[in-house]
Each structure stands twice: as structure tokens, then as C-alpha cells.
Design a protein with these regions (language model features):
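Cysteine-centered motifs
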Residues: 4-6
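Nucleic-acid modification enzymes, centered on SAM-dependent nucleic-acid methyltransferases
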Residues: 15, 19-131, 139-474, 490-517, ...
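Conserved SAM/SAH-binding loop
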Residues: 135
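Hydrophobic beta-strand segment of the Class I
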Residues: 478-479
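A short glycine-rich, Lys/Arg-flanked "PGG" loop and its adjoining helix->strand segment in the class I
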Residues: 525-541, 566
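Conserved beta-strand signature within the Rossmann-like core of class I S-adenosyl-L-methionine
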Residues: 543-549
Length: 867
């Protein structure tokens, strides 16, 4: 690939700043990384053409180590004085920034939101990593820390006066070649003048050859004395043709169902031949047979007819039905050959990518009408011959989806581009847009978005995050927004773009849930565990990773937590994104999956890890963990003039974190809950049911003098025994209702128990009270204090173990059980190192039960590897 002039202009300045010189990627370079996981599908020539070494390669980047040696700093625990608490401030950044909207890539995080995290966790000159970089917003954020816009800088200086401005150096990676190509252009020098000039020239040259295909004769009512003799088509509406199930008549859907005056689409429509009232689902599609010249075979494709043309003439817009001349032009186009290359790949395997096989869209070229394909092919031919091809290719791909057959015609919507995001859905009415208008409009948008690009201080790689070409303990911070469950099948959705650029995703290493390619939740979790383990290896000790999470399924949330913990990270803070106000609120895991999440996790110091191994089995490991964990949790977070209660500082979550860390690292859990809770009160300072280190408590007490603590009442849905116990703790809390009799509790409890989880054997209220609470002389149930709680816990666990033994002695699938008994049983079997029994019982439980309970999943997952 030829170097862009805009980049050549900057080589002189670049060589003064860094020893890294631009070079051409060679086949010898590619051979060094050919066996790296996630190496994309494509020829060496196509990979070399896309690449801009050493800063960007369309394959695993063999120069990352050189980049880190140039910009990074070595880690030494003896001299390291870094300390940060998790970022706990509100974040509100909209999605209307020009750079956010320049390309139609599937998902993006606003770069100004990421800047806040980078500024909080890093110093100028630090290395920032994102292994699922998408369009490179983490890189944009890192680079813009040097040159923010004035308004944003003033806001940050007011909200975060402690931050240090200055460039951070991003290392970006993604499995998708289209993502890294976009990332490169968003994080490189961008000569706006050269881009605009070349893009306009390409459009003009293409229009000279293909513009006639978008001309139409005006109707009599729109004719006037203007010099123009023809109008320019803005879009053409194509309608599916159905077959009446009663008489076999062909029905053009638009003619039968759309009110041309109001634009409303009727649910029911009549067959013009027999008068039967029909719905779309009652009818089969009609099909046409045609010769696919590129694939050299005859194919069946869904029958569509042009039904409406919107055009511009004399400066005004009009609509008309296609006339004989329009149909003649379309026929001429269908019979002509396209003299330029265009992709004709078979759509990749997958549920989404093959969803349109049934209507005849089996190959990439089938997703475009013939004149659109001819126009795109001419444009791309010119782009590939340009010395500015890298910039022009992202401009080219930015409108491919909008001008494809996926652009739905929505008569009551004025916006011209309406594909259904996150899918390859083709509607029964398609709006074939004029590509010249589409691309003309994007020129200024790209110029506006990229005019302030911060230069070449980034390193971008294309491959799997399961195997990054980076050394140990070299990265200062990680911000990552990985794929979550079955939210989006990225490789399938990117296939149209990537087919044009000639390099496609190797989906074997794509961390998603996709049953069509044999990836269920366990396979997803395994890939995410490997990715997080690679992050853990690369991140410096005592440093932070921020993970964005978007999924409503509890099982996926548990899989992510499991993957994080298994890789060695410790979660210190979880917050939800309130979509209405774009603000963050702290939550517990029980409600976490209902909103988007921001997870703050840290890598412990090496000395701490050594101590845990050396003292394994000693209760000191529990307290070492707590001390380290408390030091990484915010001391005071004030929201709405109230001190926020930190769930991470409360006894139950400290215990859960301690147990999980020990189990994940293969270290014996040294304390049961009773001894742990007693030890917390003895060894740490307690304020408002939260625990603090001695050097933290003064800061909290000072804030407490002037600020009240928020009054939290978590919204609890009683669906199983565990949530029932939590609800009772809330009811009996002195700050809520306090001690109550059975008669007072029972009606309220019955109101709360609206729907019990499937398979859950819910105990009677009396049983739950007897096993978890104490009764005073007036018959009121109350929460036991620490001195009396131990005996109660032991009695309860004895009863639950007895119940669990009954499950062990039974046969077949467990269809109804107490989940609390399963938890107690797994915990005891773990202490006895009876991993086989854990696996045996787990495999008799419903899959949903294991996947949606983080504790059971943890015991089962680790035991499975030890059987």
C-alpha cells in the first residue's frame, strides 16, 4: 500500500519524537505471527495493503514489543508508589460527538467517557491497553488527554482537579479487521484537505460513469422551465411480492398494504384477484430466477418490484411510480456486466449471516441491487488506486450497510437510512438509496470528526485477545468493552464490510454465545477467562482494569465474574449505568444485570500473591486479603449530598470476595463465616455497617461530621430462600421496622413471594425464621448479634447438610430442592476435597441453576478441573 501524503508530511516530526520509523509490512514479518491465535482470513497481499507498520497491522502486530519499549516504563514493586481507588464519580457523556457517529460500526463507547477513566487511573506517558478496541475509542481518549477541547478540559479540571493532562500511549487490539482499520484511521494523522479533495474526485469520476443509473424523467406536474431535463433519484422503494394462498395470485405488498397518502402500513390486506383478507405470515414469497455472473450459476432470489421513486428536480423533491423508462433502465442495468472487482463470497457460517439464505441472499453481492453494486465497484477500484486508500476505505465502508438491501423503507420516517441495527434483517420493503448522496454527506462528517486527530502514538494489532504479543507486567491500565453473551455476533455482522477490504475475522476465537457455530455459555466463559488471564499477565501489579458490561442475563453476568476471578483479578466496585440520566449508581450483584455495568477490578501486588501461597491454610491469608481489598475501595463517595454506603465494605461481600479469591487461587479457605465476621469486628474499625483500615477511618469520620449517610433500602424480589432471608434481614433491621412477631411478618412475606424460582423448594416462613433469627420473650424475631450468631449458623448448616445428604443419596435429576442446602453442601464437600461429589450433584441440577448462581458455578467450575 502506498503511503499517504498526509502521513509522509508527519514523518519528519515523528522521527524527532520517537525512534519508531514507518516501514512496510513484509511476508517475513507475517510469517512470525501467522500461527498466533486470531490471525485473520485473507491473503498476505491484502493484509499488507491494509497495514501501516509498525503502528498498525491487519494481523497480529509483530512490533508491539518495540512500541512498549519505546514508550513504556518497567515495573519494580520496590520503587512503585502508585495508588488509586476505583473511579466512583458520575459519568455522563452523550453519543452525539462527530467521531462517535462517523462510522456505523456496531457498538462504541463515547471517547470522552473513557477519558475520565484514563485520567483517573493513569499518568501522562502510561501505556493503556484495550484488547476489544472496536473503533478505537480508547485510543482516541488516550491521545486526546494531551489536547482536549477547552470546554471538556474546564469540566474535568472542576470535577477532577487531581488529574494530570498529557498523552497516554494506547495499545489496541481487536479480532475484527474492519474494527482495527477504523481504529487506525481514528488514531492516526488525518489530512482533512487531502481527504476531502480525493473523496470528491472519486465521487465525480464514479458519477461520470454510473450517474445515468440514478436519473429519471420528471412527471408532468413537476416539469417546469428549468434547464434540467431529468431528475436525480434520491431513493427507489422495492417491495416484496407474495403469493395468495387461496388463488395463487401474485400480490405486490406495497400496492396491497401501504396507504400512499398517509404512509401507514396495514396489518391486513386483500388479494386483488380473489378478495381474501391476508396477513404477511399467511403468504409465501414469490421468487425470480436469474444468472449470477460473478458466481457463474443460476440462482433463485426473492421477487421484488420497484414501486416508488423519490427524486429531486429543479431544487424540489417529488415522488412517482416507476414509468416505462425507469423499468427500461433497470432492465439494461440487470443485463450489463460490471467491469470492476466486487466481493462475491459465500456468507460466513452463522445464524445471523445465513438468516437470508431462505430468500436467496446467500453471497455478499446479493445484498446489493445491481446499480448499487456497479457504483460501489467503480468507487472501490478508484480508492484502491489512490495513495490515500487507507482513509478512503473507512469512508467507503461507513455507508455500505445503509445503501444495501438492509435499508428498510419506513414511510413515516424521514431519515433516509434505516437498517435494523445488530442484525442483517431484510425488510419486505427496501429503500435503495442513492450512493452518491450517501457518500457526499459522509465527507464533511469524517472531516469534522477527524480534523483534530492526535497523531501516530498508538499501536494497533488484529488478532485474538487470548494471545497478545506483549510481555508481562508492562501495561499501566486496561479499559475494555468485550462482547457479552449473545448480544451481537460481530464477525457475522462485519462480514459485508470485511469482504470488501479482503480480510475477514477468524471467528473461532470470537468470545460470544452462538449456538449456530457450537458456542454455548461454557465456551464463551472459557474464551473470556483466557482473555482476562492474558490481561492479568500483561497488566502491572497494583493496577486497574475497567470492564463495561451490557447483558440482561444473570448467567452471562456470573460467567464474567467467574472469568475475572479465575484469571486472578479482584473486583472492587460495580456500578450501573442509569440510561435515563447517564449516571452511575452502585449496586449489588442481585440487581446488577438489569442495567449496563462498569466493573472496576485490580491486579494484586506480587508480594501479596506470594504471601497468600506461603501462608496457605493459615487464617492470616483471610485478613491479608481483607486489608489489601479495603485499601482498594473508595473511603468516601458522596452522591446527592449523602455518603454512599459501599457494599464492598460490608461484612457479607467481604466474606464472599475472600472465599472466592481463595478458591479460585487453590488456597484453602481458613475461616467460616462466623469466625470471619467476629474477626472483622476485632481487627478493623466499623462505621455505619462498613469496615475501614486505621488510616482510612479519620477521612470517613471527618466526612460523617458534615454529611449524612444515604438511607438505602434495596428493592428485593423474594424468589428463593436466599432472597427471603435478605428480605427478613431488611425487615428486622433496627433502622427499618425492627423486631417483629410471626403474625406481623407473615402477611407482608406472603405479599412479597409472588413467583418462586423454578426448581426452588421454598421453606415455610417459620422454618426460615428458626434457622436464621432469634426470638425474644415477647415472641418477636430479631437479628442475632455476633456473639450468638455462630451457634445459630452451625445449627442451620447442620439442618441444610442433612437435606443435602438426602439429595446425594437420591438418584436422577433433581427437580425440586433448597438452593441454600446445595450451597452449604458444595462448601462442605469443597473443604473435604470431594470434588467428584460436587461435579456429580452439579450435573444432576438444572443447567440454569448452576449458571445463574455465582457461588455454585465457582465450586462446580473449579471442581470440574480437579476430577
Amino acid at each position: 500500500m502506498k503511503l499517504c501524503k498526509c502521513r509522509l508530511h508527519n514523518l519528519e516530526n515523528e522521527s524527532e519524537e520517537t525512534a519508531m520509523e514507518r516501514r512496510k509490512l513484509t511476508k517475513e514479518d507475517i510469517d512470525k505471527v501467522r500461527n498466533i491465535e486470531g490471525f485473520p482470513l485473507g491473503t498476505d497481499e491484502d493484509i499488507i495493503a491494509l497495514s501501516d507498520a509498525p503502528f498498525y497491522t491487519a494481523c497480529p502486530n509483530p512490533f508491539i514489543e518495540d512500541f512498549i519499549k519505546e514508550y513504556g516504563t518497567p515495573y519494580d514493586e520496590a520503587t512503585d508508589d502508585y495508588h488509586r481507588e476505583p473511579f466512583a464519580a458520575d459519568v455522563s457523556e452523550g453519543k452525539n460527538d462527530p467521531i462517535y457517529n462517523a462510522h456505523t460500526y456496531h457498538t462504541k463507547v463515547p471517547h470522552k467517557a473513557i477519558m475520565r477513566y484514563i485520567l483517573h487511573y493513569t499518568n501522562p506517558g502510561d501505556i493503556v491497553l484495550d484488547g476489544f478496541c472496536g473503533t478505537g475509542m480508547t485510543g482516541v481518549a488516550a491521545n486526546m488527554c494531551e489536547h482536549p477541547d477547552n470546554e471538556f478540559r474546564m469540566t474535568i479540571d472542576h470535577e477532577m482537579p487531581y488529574v494530570k493532562w498529557g498523552r497516554r500511549y494506547p495499545v489496541l487490539n481487536d479480532l475484527a479487521p474492519i474494527a482495527t482499520l477504523i481504529s487506525r484511521n481514528y488514531n492516526a494523522d488525518f489530512d482533512v484537505t487531502e481527504f476531502e479533495r480525493e473523496a470528491e474526485k472519486i465521487l465525480e469520476d464514479t458519477k461520470r460513469e454510473c450517474g445515468w443509473m440514478y436519473k429519471t424523467n420528471p412527471t408532468e406536474e413537476s416539469q417546469n422551465s428549468f434547464v434540467e431535463t431529468q431528475g436525480t433519484i434520491l431513493y427507489t422503494v422495492w417491495s416484496d411480492v407474495y403469493i395468495c394462498p387461496h388463488c395463487g395470485n401474485e400480490i405486490v405488498f406495497y400496492d396491497a398494504a401501504v396507504d400512499s397518502e398517509t404512509g401507514k402500513v396495514a396489518d391486513n390486506f386483500k388479494c386483488s384477484a380473489c378478495g381474501a383478507t391476508l396477513k404477511k405470515r399467511d403468504c409465501d414469497n414469490a421468487f425470480d430466477t436469474y444468472f449470477d455472473e460473478k458466481n457463474n450459476d443460476t440462482r433463485r432470489i426473492i421477487k421484488q418490484r420497484p414501486v416508488l421513486i423519490a427524486y429531486q428536480f429543479g431544487g424540489k423533491r417529488y415522488k412517482k411510480a416507476p414509468d416505462d423508462n425507469d423499468l427500461s433502465i433497470l432492465s439494461k442495468i440487470e443485463n450489463m456486466s460490471i467491469p470492476y472487482w466486487y466481493p462475491s463470497n459465500r456468507m460466513c457460517e452463522g445464524k445471523e449471516s445465513r438468516r437470508n439464505d431462505k430468500i436467496g441472499l446467500t453471497h455478499v453481492n446479493h445484498y446489493f441491487y445491481k446499480r448499487t453494486l456497479a457504483t460501489l465497484a467503480k468507487m472501490y477500484d478508484l480508492i484502491c488506486k489512490s495513495e490515500h486508500a487507507d482513509m478512503l476505505k473507512i469512508w467507503f465502508t461507513s455507508q455500505i450497510i445503509n445503501i444495501s438491501k438492509m435499508n428498510r423503507y419506513r414511510p413515516q420516517v424521514s431519515f433516509p437510512y434505516n437498517p435494523l441495527s445488530g442484525t442483517l434483517y431484510v425488510s419486505s420493503m427496501v429503500s435503495e438509496a442513492n450512493p452518491f448522496n450517501a457518500y457526499e454527506g459522509k465527507i464533511k462528517k469524517f472531516s469534522l470528526a477527524l480534523r483534530n486527530n492526535a497523531g501516530n502514538c498508538s499501536c494497533i494489532s488484529t488478532g485474538s485477545t487470548t494471545q497478545l504479543l506483549v510481555g508481562d507486567n508492562v501495561c499501566d491500565y486496561i479499559f475494555t468493552d468485550p462482547p457479552f453473551g449473545a448480544n451481537l455476533n460481530y464477525s457475522e455482522l462485519s462480514f459485508l464490510w470485511e469482504s470488501w477490504i479482503g480480510v475477514t475475522t477468524r471467528s473461532k476465537f470470537e468470545a460470544i454465545v452462538n449456538q449456530a457455530v457450537g458456542k454455548a455459555l461454557p465456551e464463551y466463559q472459557e474464551l473470556m477467562t483466557r482473555c482476562f488471564a492474558e490481561y492479568f499477565r500483561i497488566l502491572k501489579p497494583n493496577r486497574w482494569m475497567t470492564v463495561e458490561f451490557h447483558n440482561s442475563q444473570n448467567a452471562v453476568w456470573n460467567a464474567i465474574q467467574e472469568a475475572l476471578q479465575k484469571s486472578g483479578f479482584i473486583v472492587a466496585d460495580v456500578r450501573t449505568l442509569d440510561k435515563q440520566g447517564s449516571s452511575f449508581k452502585q449496586v449489588t450483584a442481585a440487581t446488577a444485570v438489569k442495567q449496563d455495568l462498569v466493573i472496576s477490578a485490580y491486579k494484586p501486588k506480587e508480594s501479596f500473591i506470594r504471601e497468600m501461597v506461603e501462608k496457605a491454610g493459615n487464617e492470616d491469608t483471610a485478613w491479608s486479603f481483607v486489608r489489601q481489598h479495603l485499601s482498594n475501595i473508595p473511603v468516601v463517595v458522596i452522591k446527592n449530598n449523602r455518603i454512599e454506603v459501599s457494599a464492598e465494605r460490608q461484612a457479607y461481600l467481604l466474606f464472599d470476595r475472600m472465599v472466592a479469591y481463595h478458591i479460585m487461587q487453590g488456597i484453602p479457605v481458613p475461616l467460616d463465616s462466623t469466625d470471619f465476621y467476629r474477626g472483622l469486628d476485632e481487627k478493623f474499625l466499623k462505621r455505619d455497617n462498613m469496615y475501614f483500615l486505621p488510616d482510612q477511618v479519620n477521612e470517613y469520620d471527618t466526612a460523617r461530621i458534615t454529611t449524612e449517610v444515604e438511607n438505602i433500602q434495596f428493592e428485593l424480589f423474594v424468589t428463593n430462600e436466599k432472597s427471603a432471608i435478605s428480605w427478613l434481614y431488611q425487615q428486622l433491621d433496627e433502622q427499618f421496622c425492627g423486631p417483629q412477631t410471626y403474625a406481623e411478618l407473615q402477611p407482608k412475606f406472603m405479599q412479597e413471594v409472588k413467583a418462586v424460582d423454578k426448581y426452588e423448594q421454598m421453606p415455610e416462613l417459620a422454618t426460615i425464621l428458626e434457622e436464621n433469627f432469634l426470638q425474644d420473650e415477647k415472641g418477636r424475631w430479631y437479628i442475632p448479634d455476633v456473639t450468638k450468631e455462630g451457634d445459630l449458623v452451625k445449627l442451620r448448616e447442620k439442618n441444610l447438610w442433612k437435606e443435602f445428604e438426602g439429595y446425594m443419596n437420591s438418584k436422577g435429576k433433581l427437580k425440586l430442592f433448597r438452593s441454600e442446602a446445595i450451597r452449604v453442601g458444595f462448601s462442605r464437600l469443597w473443604k473435604e476435597k470431594n470434588y467428584k461429589a460436587i461435579v456429580d450433584i452439579a450435573e444432576r441440577l438444572p443447567e440454569q441453576t448452576i449458571q445463574e448462581d455465582s457461588n455454585l458455578l465457582m465450586y462446580y467450575d473449579i471442581s470440574l478441573g480437579r476430577v
